[in-house]
Every structure is written in structure tokens, then in C-alpha cells.
């Protein structure tokens, strides 16, 4: 009997430790900002201004753009296709305050409804201690009385300072052709970031992940792999935007174009990984293997 009680106590203790290890460390910061910590990773989100991700660090090393002119920094979330709102970004989703709720180990942020598009956004942040990622699940809720179509779209800005972008796709399938000098190597497409006098954007049908290596860090984002027919009209699973000059880059991914009935919602999850990246930012089998080891965790 004593042995049975001891085993039960040990199992309960292990269960508590596992639950503790999986708990998101959420801290209230200044002026409506919240931070999440997972091991060496820290993410800072600004609920007061569009629910934007302002910072993503490994220890003290930052991977996101920290420029401070509009639409040049951090990571945001929009509806797709863009032709339905064009420019500037919808203020209810990109600029205005989100309400905040802490639900156990999940940090939830919810937007207002835009009068034209009739969608409400919700962003849920948590950590995964087992695979050392930060997990973001985005929701789009149809608050209208009509059937509507939409796709989720994450836009992550990094500095253009000699980095390397790569993902699995044939380089000659990236469109429009010849806007960026993607090259095939090790069964992936690679682009050593450059600068030009004009803005450039390309599209690709990838395999559910997108990577960026620079300044000793490797950022990998994992999301649902789409069939070629699934993105919104004129859009793509993976997009890369280079702002003119040597300013910033947008690493973009999109989910499936979905029909939503009134009050129906879609959800789409992106896992963020950030690890040290030794050596030069150049194509290599070792770098591809490192990225895919994160994707396949």
C-alpha cells in the first residue's frame, strides 16, 4: 500500500512539474504591452496599438525590425485578399487597441469590428516548452449577417542588413519572375537580401514554413501547407516584400481562403522558432537541416 501511495505521489509530482513547464510566462509591461517568455525566448506584444508583436528576442538579440516609421516594424496580422481594403492597413486590426484576457496559460487579444469588412480578429499567444516555440493562433470572426470569404495573413518585418531568406519551392516557380534573385540549392529556394531603388514583392507555393537567417539568429515560422488552389485570389502561401533601399523586409504567410457564414470563425496557427545560427548567412545543407529540424519537432 505504501509503495502504491509513493508511486501515485510521484506521478502527481511529475504531472505538476510538466504542467508548470508548459505554463506561459506572461508579464504585464508598460502602457498596454505584454511579454511572453519561453526559455531563451521573449516576445513583446502591444495590445494598445493593433496587437502588434514589437519584439522577438533570443536572450538579448533582436530579430524583428525596430524602425519607428509607420508600417516598418514588428509583426502584424491582416485580412486577405488585400484588394478588398488596399491601403492603408485597416485601423481596427492594425492600429487601434485590442481588449486583453488572460485565460490560464493563453494570452488573448481581441479587436474591434471594421465597419466595411465586418470581421473581428482575435490573437491567442502561448508557449510550448516542449519544442521551445511561441504559438500564435489567429481567429477571424464574421460579425456580419452575410456569407463572407477571407484568408488569414501574417506580416513579419525584419531589417534588410545582409540576411538570408529560404523555404522549400523551386526558384523558377516564384512569381513575378526575376524580381528577386532566388537560387536553387539543397532542394530549397534561397535569397541573399539585397537593395534596390524600388519596392519588390514575390509569391511562392511553399511547404508550410519560412526561414530567415541573419546576425547569428535563425527565425523559422511554421504554418499550414496550402494546395496551390487554396490561397485568396491573387495571393500566395508565402510572400516576401523588400522595401526600397536598405530598410526592411516583410516575411509573409497566408492561410486558406475560407467561406464564413454569419458569426462563423476560422482559426490559423503559426509557430515561431528562434535559435542561434552559427557561421555566415549563406546557403548550406547544415542550415537547411537546422531549419527543418525545428519544423519537424
Report residues per predicted region.
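Short Pro-Gly-centered flexible turn/kink motifs
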Residues: 100, 259-276
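Terminal connector regions
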Residues: 273-297
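Extended, loop-rich substrate-binding clefts of extracytoplasmic carbohydrate-active enzymes
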Residues: 23-28, 37, 81-131, 147-150, ...
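Acidic-aromatic substrate-binding/catalytic surfaces of carbohydrate-active enzymes
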Residues: 33-94
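Bacterial N-terminal signal peptides
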Residues: 7-16
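Boundary at the C-terminal end of the N-terminal hydrophobic targeting segment
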Residues: 19-21
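A contiguous, surface-exposed recognition patch within enzymatic or periplasmic domains that forms
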Residues: 34, 41-43, 51-54, 62, ...
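Positively charged n-region of N-terminal signal peptides that target proteins for export
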Residues: 1-4
